[in-house]
Amino acid sequence: MPKFRNSEEQAAWQMAEALSEKGFSCMRQAEEAAENFRSGKMQMRRNFKARGLSEVDADIRWSGMTAARKALADNGWYMSQASMYNEAAAAQYAKALYLKNADEA
């Protein structure tokens, strides 16, 4: 834990930490959505292979399914949320650093 010179610096640091944690949480959810898409695609390929159909047919069928669209939409949503939270955290870290340097001057 860093040493703080004033309460504003500490508040900025704590806000940055909280935003960073939310960003990581969103990233984990995005990874779960991507894994759901991948596992669904593989399952569809196995099912089609068992029936003697091609992987291309399985991919076409999978891409049209609601579960695939939801997984892709969830991935995109959570990735954008993670990006937003990480950018906000970076701004708060910069603010804390600025406040620290301003106190030293």
Q: What is each stretch, according to the model?
A:
Residues 1-35, 72:
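Short, charge/polar-rich alpha-helical segments
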Residues 26, 64-99:
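Amphipathic alpha-helical coiled-coil segments
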Residues 2, 42, 48, 72-73:
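Arg/Lys-rich, low-complexity, intrinsically disordered basic segments
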Residues 4-5, 26-27, 50-57, 77-79:
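Charged, low-complexity interaction regions
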Residues 32, 39, 46, 84, ...:
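Heptad-repeat coiled-coil alpha-helices
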Residues 29-64:
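Extended alpha-helical coiled-coil "stalk/arm" regions
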Residues 11, 18, 40, 60-67, ...:
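Alpha-helical oligomerization interfaces
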